[in-house]
């Protein structure tokens, strides 16, 4: 790519020198016999330049496309590898803008700006040397004219970098608002907050518009300056050059070659503003992307594989905090779940139930103690083997914009049709067979074409289909009516009998699925026993279940 570009510059700069030879030779001396070979040489150089431009563009497009694809792949893989802690701190719109608009900015610079930055600098240096060799007084005039351009360019670079960063950050904020409005449109309509949300969007859009106008205004002033200086220099060179020809200091051919070479500098100089602007935007985009690529993942693969897991799950003095300077959310957690045991986790809202269940598949890592499966610390296991042994279904089910079948088989793509139907029956999700195109029906983004209960049942079917050694159900029955819940619970008994289960429960009927019940209060397990034992001996447990039942039936 660069080699063809450099050759192209060399060929284009040779043409004015051939023109000088034609004017000062055959034309001035009227030697027609020399005109044909020199003319053919000029024609050959022009054709060569065209071919080199074609080769450069082909190589340029392929190289840049490959680079963009590689960067996008690396960025996506990195986003998938980063832990929940990272994603909880970042707005999805900011991440989206980095994967899309920032990569496009880098692609444009690598495909156009970087190449021409190198070519133009090379051309400026070579042409300046040629101008000085052709007639040094006029060459000095060109050099003097370049000084203010360099000074202004350096000042422009600093200002443009700062304003480009503001524009790109505001684009990310606006993308976040658009995404949140699209995902939460039902809530917006239900509460009649369309105008309120629209005003928030308009405020962000106006802010972005004003910053973008400031950016264009700054660039326009710089580009105008770059237009004026070369044109003034051309006028001066024409005047002084004509005088030099009149005094026979240089030949007419030399003046024509000088002016032709000088005119070849106009594009590099005029494009300097555009290229520097692109460079600053690309630097800003690269910095924004580096914020993701350079983030260290705190949750990484361990050295061991979990082979033929039995599901013996233990919590040993487990504690957890979200950040080093925060208080413990969980502390002194000790539980022992032999294979095939189901534990119901009961606690008030905010007591840490969801956080505790998230520690098992290492969505977060414990900050104290350890969790083991079959005697292996989960931190010593590869993430693939751990998460194939642990399946989770959450109270807020996530479905993807794909078919119902693809959503269900996400954790087990090779599942047979019989296994899929069995999982649907257990989760009471056979309604999926009655969708317009059956299981091949696309459920829309976040599964918005389905009801809350339907989404929850599909998510439960997905977890059941995975056939894990450890099954974590984080209040996955909360959106079901009493009748459907009873049917699901009856089917789940058979599933839980063959696996180790943790069930976050708010209703007595769900608690009855478990062999043991653990009461979580103030971030720690205060009581463990059967439902009957806790109901008889722990007033706080009775009060909590009674309150939950009243809320359900209210």
Give residue ranges: language-model regions.
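Short intracellular "coupling" helices and adjacent cytoplasmic loop segments at the cytosolic face
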Residues: 65, 73-97, 101-103, 176-200, ...
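An intracellular "coupling" helix at the cytosolic face of ABC transporter transmembrane type-1 domains
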Residues: 84-88, 101-110, 114, 118, ...
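Membrane-integrated ABC transporters
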Residues: 1-15, 27-38, 56-60, 64, ...
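Alpha-helical transmembrane segments of multi-pass membrane proteins
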Residues: 45-64, 115-122, 141-169, 219-222, ...
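ABC-type nucleotide-binding domain
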Residues: 301, 307-554
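Transmembrane helices of ABC transporter permease
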Residues: 1-7, 41, 112-166, 239-250
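Transmembrane helix-loop-helix hairpins at lipid-water interfaces of multipass membrane proteins
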Residues: 2-52, 132-137, 248-252
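Helix-loop-helix
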Residues: 28-37, 130-144, 218-287, 292-293
